[in-house]
Regions:
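C-terminal structural segments of small proteins and small subunits
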Residues: 56-90
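Short, Lys/Arg-enriched N-terminal segments with co-localized hydrophobic residues
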Residues: 1-6
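Amphipathic, hydrophobic secondary-structure cores in small proteins
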Residues: 8-11, 15-28, 32-63
Length: 90
């Protein structure tokens, strides 16, 4: 329980549900646990954007794996403890 309380998560945006599901399955095969969810409001200007949620500690490895697999991804965000999003690299 406490582990989840202090765990930091990140989101990788995908342009469709299909791409988000492909990304999550690819990461799962590589041993990285992730979930697919609708992207939070404000994370994208597109209406049907989905996100892959994973531990922040696995973000860099996940981006490499998805790039190698040829899965298109969008912006990445860290989920802050107060519920806000912080774009990675800004």
């Amino acid at each position: 329980m406490w582990e989840d309380f202090f765990m930091q998560y990140s989101l990788i945006l995908c342009r469709s549900l299909t791409y988000a599901q492909r990304a999550a399955h690819t990461l799962e095969r590589a041993g990285i646990t992730s979930t697919v969810r609708k992207a939070p409001q404000g994370a994208s200007d597109r209406g049907c954007t989905y996100a892959v949620k994973l531990r922040s500690s696995a973000l860099a490895r996940s981006l490499h794996i998805l790039n190698e697999a040829g899965i298109p991804i969008g912006r990445q965000f860290h989920l802050m403890p107060d519920g806000t999003l912080q774009e990675v690299g800004t």
